Curated annotation (Swiss-Prot):
Keywords: RNA-binding, Transcription, Transcription antitermination, Transcription regulation. GO terms for molecular function: RNA binding. It holds the Pfam family NusB. One of its GO terms (biological process) is DNA-templated transcription termination. This is Transcription antitermination protein NusB.
Length: 165
């Protein structure tokens, strides 16, 4: 099991369904925190390290995969140009016209599709939809779903084709 004060993984726990649930629940929390932090970064323009530090101080991270939160936050910022370039052909709007919450969700999901091939594309899409339901506008989750459904085959062509067989 991943202990609360380290990010060490014990392989024995990988066999346990409870461990898998715990890991995915902690990743879901990391995605939620990262979405909020990315929104703040986009809106306020504060330094990423300051935002990360603030989130770690102001929030209970005992149920958050802290390393994944950091990877998502910094990964989106570092790869923003690549992410936006991948997203743009799947949008009916420009990046600047997007709702900031949906933009944060789409950037996070696109980062996972591009850089975290260990996370199945269907999980990425589902998590993006759930984030948009929680934080986005009334029908934001439908918009996010539509964009990610267009994006996944472009970024994960082999995986998507294999799944559709």
């Amino acid at each position: 099991m991943i202990s609360d004060d380290t990010d060490q993984f014990n392989p024995r726990d990988a066999k346990s369904p409870e461990a898998a649930k715990g890991k995915s629940a902690k990743r879901r929390e990391a995605r939620q925190m990262a979405t909020q932090a990315l929104y703040q970064w986009h809106m306020a323009g504060h330094a990423l390290n300051e935002i990360e530090a603030q989130f770690r101080v102001d929030n209970d991270f005992s149920n958050v995969d802290g390393a994944y939160f950091r990877e998502l936050l910094h990964g989106v910022a570092t790869n923003k140009t690549e992410i936006d370039t991948a997203l743009s052909p799947c949008l009916d709007l420009t990046i600047e016209e997007l709702d900031p919450v949906e933009l944060a969700v789409l950037r996070l999901s696109t980062f996972e599709l591009l850089k975290r091939i260990d996370v199945p594309y269907r999980v990425v899409i589902n998590e993006g939809i759930e984030l948009a339901k929680v934080y986005g506008s009334t029908d934001g989750h439908k918009f996010v779903n539509g964009v990610l459904d267009k994006l996944a085959p472009r970024l994960r062509e082999v995986e998507v084709k294999a799944h559709k067989r």
